[in-house]
Amino acid sequence: MEYKETVKKVIAEVCRLLLGVVFIFSGTVKAVDPMGGAIKIGDYLTSFGLDKLQPFTVLISFNLSALEFMLGVCMLLGVYRRYTTFLTLLMMSFMTPLTLYLAIFNPVSDCGCFGDALVISNWQTFYKNVVLLAAAIYVFIHNQRLLQGYTYHVYWFVALWSYVFAIGFAYRNYNHLPILDFRPYKLGANIPALMSIPEGAPEDEYAYSFIYERDGVQKEFSLENYPDSTCLLYTSPSPRDM
């Protein structure tokens, strides 16, 4: 019986450590570039037809990074164990099916969960969230087995400090260049070198098509089978990816 209890505590602590580290990292890299996070949130809103919320993207970006950072700190330190594990489970219960939808239908190129610091595919994001959801379920069920780093009387200070710190850090990076710039064209980068195409890399190919009309009949032509002058141009040429 004592052995089983020890195993449960160890598993709970491992899950707590995993969730805490991931949430702190995710919140930090979002706060590093809150404007980039706002742009990504705007992509989400456009994909789901919620353009009316576009004016609030920066506000959402600030608070999302602060919430993730606060939950990560509280998870690691055992602060408000019941509420922290519940909010973490609630967030993962929302994010996991959302990332499954992204993986299947691909409305945005990447989820942006780790900003520009670590770009992963939508399927990789979904698999990551499945693991985090399982860990969140376990720590929520066994939250009383988690060790506490502080007494109950200072819980509010730890939670408030972590949230305010993340907001202040994001605000600083919003008004100045990021302290840690993960973007490809950051200050000091060689832009011509970054824009060059590596040797042997596949290049884009384009095909031009023209729609001409003769005797009321419209036909599409390419540059290879261009018609004679008796046809009238119906639409101007437009390139398309091959």
Kindly label every feature range from the protein language model.
Residues 9-32, 58-98:
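Functionalized membrane-embedded alpha-helices
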Residues 234-242:
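Single conserved hydrophobic/aromatic residue that forms the stacking wall/gate
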Residues 77-84, 144-153:
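Membrane-interface helix-boundary motifs at transmembrane edges
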Residues 1-6:
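Short, Lys/Arg-rich, polar N-terminal cytosolic tail immediately upstream
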Residues 93-146:
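Membrane-embedded alpha-helical segments of integral membrane proteins
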Residues 149-177:
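Internal/C-terminal transmembrane anchor helices
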Residues 174-194:
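Alpha-helical transmembrane signal-anchor/signal-peptide segments
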Residues 40-53:
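Perimembrane loop-to-helix junctions flanking transmembrane segments
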